[in-house]
UniProtKB/Swiss-Prot annotation:
The lineage of its organism: Bacteria, Pseudomonadati, Pseudomonadota, Gammaproteobacteria, Lysobacterales. The accessory proteins ExbB and ExbD seem to form a complex with TonB. Involved in the TonB-dependent energy-dependent transport of various receptor-bound substrates. Coiled coil: none annotated. It comes from the Bacteria. This is Biopolymer transport protein exbD2. Keywords: Cell inner membrane, Cell membrane, Membrane, Protein transport, Transmembrane, Transmembrane helix, Transport. It comes from Xanthomonas campestris pv. campestris (strain ATCC 33913 / DSM 3586 / NCPPB 528 / LMG 568 / P 25). Belongs to the ExbD/TolR family. It holds the Pfam family ExbD. Its main location: membrane.
Length: 136
């Protein structure tokens, strides 16, 4: 019995890919078999076609201009208004047409107190005004 020690050949650097191909083919077969089982129908409620035309868009109402001057006086469309009555006025505007509210444009003087501005914003929030803009 003669065994060869391999002398000058060095280590074997080739990878035997046959087991790798066998494993990949088995995984492919498993995937092919299980893929049709994994699909199942999903009930989807599709929207029905409406034959009625869309509602006509109404013209937006004119904006409300709210101005706060340097002496902390509030003007509702250029008429002086106490801060305590702002929420009531805003609620009346919102209740007149909740879906088509006018834009509230606030123009505050840079010397006005923050407290007045905070009260105006709180009144707008409490009356559920949706469109609020700030002017310079």
């Amino acid at each position: 019995m003669a065994f060869s020690t391999g002398g000058n050949r060095g280590p074997m650097a080739d990878i035997n890919v046959t087991p790798l191909v066998d494993v990949m083919l088995v995984l492919l077969i498993i995937f092919i078999v299980t893929a049709p089982i994994m699909t199942y129908p999903i009930a989807v409620d599709l929207p029905q076609r409406v034959l009625n035309p869309p509602p006509q868009t109404t013209e937006p109402p004119p904006p409300i201009e709210l101005r706060i001057d340097a002496s902390n006086q509030v003007f509702w469309n250029n008429s002086p208004t106490p801060v305590a009555q702002l929420q009531q006025k805003m609620e009346e505007v919102v209740q007149a047409d909740p879906t088509n509210q006018p834009e509230l444009r606030i123009d505050a003087n840079e010397d006005a107190e923050y407290e007045v501005m905070a009260k105006v914003l709180a009144a707008a929030k409490n009356s559920q005004m949706k469109k609020i803009g700030f002017m310079q």
